[in-house]
């Protein structure tokens, strides 16, 4: 675990990219020189002092190959990290915010006489900031903390890749037996509205638009995000909605499809029910709510732990989804749980 603390250094200085750019076995000095050419010369002195240890530890983690005489070489994992920037930023997130929360888990449990489960904004992540004297950050949500500490843009880059592992969203749900084609094609084009709640930079909507260009135009695709660093997504209709505010109701009524992908696992059961209830109140009889999260099993156990430690959230089983649906006045009409990747739950 201590070696994981060096991952943010490797990502910050682009050590993986520089090693791959060299294209042959290289010393830490070679990598540092490469950084001065690929980035800026002022970085050389900063990275030179820690590069050898960082490269060695990344080799120990399997992210690159360790060769004799303190020589390093890119391997398949290195190439994956370079070719998939979201993976590097994901690694940075889990070894920054995630590792911080993990380090303070037992301390918080002991200090609170093992109070569990955690509640939103009262997790080991906030407790870490409290004990470090950051009283303001200790009261903030992890996203607000990342915004204030300059980490949110990196996190958004990580989330850009959350849909890119096993094909596009339409391909993935088709393979699981969900009839997205039938749902869209059986509806008059002027009545089609797809609302992606917490949709980041709009990747899911853009994948749907690319698959159904004859059906989905900008006015059909509504991106709802409450995130200060998202920026403009010109191909979709952007709309702010802070569902956390008690008086803030879902502004789009009667949409054909409401989507939540990797949103509810960030929320406790109580907060999830609040959000689901707000959507349920505006759904028409023909409306569908489509949820995509990781299937809760051994493969997603690390993500499950991260959600608990930072968000008081969790991955969920079929029985847990059914309980949430019932509390929100909804009914599950389709569900599929692959052994790897994202499950699909329709309400």
Swiss-Prot record:
Q: Name the pathway it acts in.
A: Secondary metabolite biosynthesis
**Keywords, sorted A to Z:** Methyltransferase, S-adenosyl-L-methionine, Transferase
> For binding S-adenosyl-L-methionine, which residues are annotated in this chain's numbering?
166
Q: One MF term from GO for this chain?
A: O-methyltransferase activity
What are the EC numbers? 2.1.1.-
InterPro entries on file: COMT-like, O_MeTrfase_dom, SAM-dependent_MTases_sf
Gene3D superfamilies referenced in this protein's UniProt entry, alphabetically: Vaccinia Virus protein VP39
Q: Which family does it belong to?
A: Belongs to the class I-like SAM-binding methyltransferase superfamily. Cation-independent O-methyltransferase family.
What's this chain's function? O-methyltransferase; part of the gene cluster that mediates the biosynthesis of aurasperone B, a dimeric gamma-naphthopyrone. The first step in the biosynthesis of aurasperone B is the production of gamma-naphthopyrone precursor YWA1 by the non-reducing polyketide synthase albA, via condensation of one acetyl-CoA starter unit with 6 malonyl-CoA units.
> What name is this protein filed under?
O-methyltransferase aunE
Q: Give the organism the record lists.
A: Aspergillus niger (strain ATCC 1015 / CBS 113.46 / FGSC A1144 / LSHB Ac4 / NCTC 3858a / NRRL 328 / USDA 3528.7)
């Amino acid at each position: 675990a201590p070696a994981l603390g060096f991952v943010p250094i490797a990502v910050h200085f682009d050590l993986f990219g520089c090693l791959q750019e060299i294209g042959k076995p290289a010393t830490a000095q070679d990598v540092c020189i490469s950084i001065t050419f690929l980035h800026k010369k002022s970085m050389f002195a900063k990275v030179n002092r820690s590069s050898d240890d960082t490269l060695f530890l990344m080799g120990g983690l399997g992210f690159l190959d360790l060769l004799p005489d303190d020589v390093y070489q890119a391997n398949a994992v290195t190439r994956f990290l370079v070719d998939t920037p979201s993976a590097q930023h994901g690694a940075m997130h889990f070894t920054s915010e995630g590792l911080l929360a993990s380090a303070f888990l037992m301390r918080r449990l002991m200090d609170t006489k093992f109070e569990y489960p955690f509640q939103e904004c009262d997790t080991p992540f906030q407790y870490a900031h409290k004990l470090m004297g950051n009283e303001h950050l200790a009261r903030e949500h992890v996203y607000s903390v990342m915004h204030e500490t300059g980490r949110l843009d990196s996190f958004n880059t990580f989330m850009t890749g959350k849909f890119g592992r096993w094909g596009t969203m339409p391909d993935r749900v088709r393979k699981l037996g969900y009839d997205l084609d039938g749902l869209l094609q059986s509806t008059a084009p002027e009545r089609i509205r797809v609302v992606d709640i917490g949709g980041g930079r709009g990747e899911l909507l853009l994948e749907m638009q690319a698959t159904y260009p004859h059906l989905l135009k900008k006015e059909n695709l509504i991106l709802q995000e409450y995130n200060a660093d998202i920026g403009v997504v010109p191909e979709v209709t952007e709309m702010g909605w802070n569902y956390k505010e008690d008086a803030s109701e879902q502004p789009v009524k009667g949409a054909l499809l409401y989507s939540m992908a990797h949103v509810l696992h960030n929320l406790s059961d109580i907060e999830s029910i609040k959000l689901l209830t707000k959507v349920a109140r505006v759904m028409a009889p023909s409306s569908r709510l489509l949820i995509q999260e990781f299937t809760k099993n051994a493969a997603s156990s690390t993500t499950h732990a991260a959600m608990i430690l930072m968000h008081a959230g969790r991955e969920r089983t079929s029985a847990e989804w059914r309980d949430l649906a019932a509390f929100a006045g909804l009914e599950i009409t389709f569900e599929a749980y692959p052994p790897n990747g994202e499950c699909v739950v329709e309400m």
